[in-house]
């Protein structure tokens, strides 16, 4: 017997042993697959798919999100065959099917390819779609998990292939379960190691003292852009993205090992673009001012949130990281780049040179502490002048008082 459970994300207490349908945006899937009356494959996860397709109306694009499963079946799910291959298979009626495979090795198991098949001939799901027919999207994975460990990834994992975006989160799964007991040992995905979500504080009648969790600092990454065979831009920095659009702030540390980078260099501007499974793009655009300095002029970002929505912000009127041309800008302490009211970037151990890179190495750095010194010098000078003026006035009034006293004695 196979038992499946679908429970609403909203936290409703209604749970059916095999299927629950309701008017919510996405569902948590749970599969407890037995073999000889003992669990051999366990999985609990959330997912949705966004598919863009061409329509007969002036060949415009429409988008459909598959997030409310109807007529769901799990035919074809298996604990493993003679070749050591297990599979989870999900069918959303006759329109969409999804499956993922697992391969058993000597000391670990591997999450393999994810297959998504959809049929645009279904006019209910894909009204006015052209052309009609079946389409297959394959997302190749190769995640190795130790045997007897359960894989956990609460972070949003996004895979974009062509016109299809797949979102997965709150994943807990174990293939090839030993002795029917799901493991308590977790193998945590890299994204969970670098994401911290600050929980809201729940106030009682007499609020107890609370502290806001401090997110871990991000890993420092090295990024570069080339123009032909020569490096034209260098950047070293740890990046922490802060989104405050929702009631619960979302804090995301960029992991350099899973982040791609590209860019371009021009005489007056330079661009560094970062992207990964969660960030569609994060652009840093530098510009030359007064033909003697460079600065960070623009930041553009578009990223997927935990609920599958897309958060986008752009600001082309910034003024950060100012330094003379021919030098680099450095700031080892934490800095905040406020891009908008709802988005900021915290940088750690920053060093950047977007122009005049020679032999692929940083030039002499302008330290951000110099900015503070430049700010403090006029304050110190002003304070000194104010002190001198106060002494002069004090001496004047003392002399004036003595002068009057002399007249009275005379």
UniProtKB/Swiss-Prot annotation:
Keyword Transmembrane helix: yes
Single GO MF descriptor: ion channel inhibitor activity
InterPro entries membership: Lamp2-like_luminal, Lamp2-like_TM, LAMP_CS, Lysosome-assoc_membr_glycop
Residue numbers spanned by region Second lumenal domain: 229-375
Region (Important for binding and subsequent lysosomal degradation of target proteins): 401-404
Keywords: Autophagy, Cell membrane, Cytoplasmic vesicle, Disulfide bond, Endosome, Glycoprotein, Lysosome, Membrane, Signal, Transmembrane, Transmembrane helix
Record-linked Pfam families: Lamp2-like_luminal (PF01299), Lamp2_2nd (PF21222)
Record topological domains on the Cytoplasmic side: 400-410
Lumenal side, ranges: 29-375
Family the entry assigns: Belongs to the LAMP family.
Biological function: Lysosomal membrane glycoprotein which plays an important role in lysosome biogenesis, lysosomal pH regulation and autophagy. Acts as an important regulator of lysosomal lumen pH regulation by acting as a direct inhibitor of the proton channel TMEM175, facilitating lysosomal acidification for optimal hydrolase activity. Plays an important role in chaperone-mediated autophagy, a process that mediates lysosomal degradation of proteins in response to various stresses and as part of the normal turnover of proteins with a long biological half-live.
Protein name, UniProt field: Lysosome-associated membrane glycoprotein 2
């Amino acid at each position: 017997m196979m038992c499946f459970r679908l429970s609403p994300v909203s936290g409703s207490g209604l749970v059916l042993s095999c299927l629950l349908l309701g008017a919510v945006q996405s569902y948590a899937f749970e599969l407890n697959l037995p073999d000889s009356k003992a669990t051999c494959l366990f999985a609990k996860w959330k997912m949705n798919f966004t598919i863009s397709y061409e329509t007969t109306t002036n060949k415009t694009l429409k988008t459909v999100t598959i997030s409310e499963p109807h007529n769901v079946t799990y035919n074809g799910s298996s604990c493993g065959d003679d070749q050591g291959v297990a599979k989870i298979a999900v069918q959303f009626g006759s329109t969409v099917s999804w499956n993922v495979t697992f391969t058993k090795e000597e000391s670990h198991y591997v999450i393999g390819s994810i297959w998504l098949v959809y049929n645009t001939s279904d006019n209910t799901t894909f009204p006015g779609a052209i052309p009609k027919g079946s389409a297959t999207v394959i997302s190749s994975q190769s995640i190795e998990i130790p045997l007897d460990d359960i894989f956990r990834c609460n972070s949003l994992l996004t895979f974009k292939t062509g016109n299809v975006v797949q979102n997965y989160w709150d994943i807990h799964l174990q293939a090839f379960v030993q002795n029917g007991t799901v493991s308590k040992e977790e193998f945590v995905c890299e994204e969970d190691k670098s994401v911290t979500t600050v929980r809201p504080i729940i106030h009682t009648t007499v609020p107890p003292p609370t502290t806001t969790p401090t997110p871990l600092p991000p890993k420092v990454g090295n990024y570069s852009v080339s123009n032909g065979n020569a490096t034209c831009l260098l950047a070293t920095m740890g990046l922490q993205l802060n989104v405050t659009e929702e009631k619960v702030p979302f804090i995301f540390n960029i992991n350099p090992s899973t982040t791609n980078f590209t860019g371009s260099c021009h005489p007056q501007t330079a661009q560094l673009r970062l992207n990964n499974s969660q960030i569609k793009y994060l652009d840093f655009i530098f510009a030359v001012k007064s033909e003697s300095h460079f600065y960070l002029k623009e930041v553009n970002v578009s990223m997927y949130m935990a609920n599958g929505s897309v958060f986008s912000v752009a600001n082309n009127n910034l003024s950060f990281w100012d330094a003379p041309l021919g030098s680099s800008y450095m700031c080892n302490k934490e800095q905040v780049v406020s891009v908008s009211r709802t988005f900021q970037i915290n940088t750690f151990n920053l060093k950047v040179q977007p122009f005049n890179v020679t032999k692929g190495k940083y030039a002499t750095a302008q330290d951000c502490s110099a900015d503070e010194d430049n700010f403090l010098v006029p304050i110190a000078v002003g304070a000194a002048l104010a002190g001198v003026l106060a002494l002069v006035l004090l001496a004047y009034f003392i002399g004036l008082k003595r002068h009057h006293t002399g007249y009275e004695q005379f």
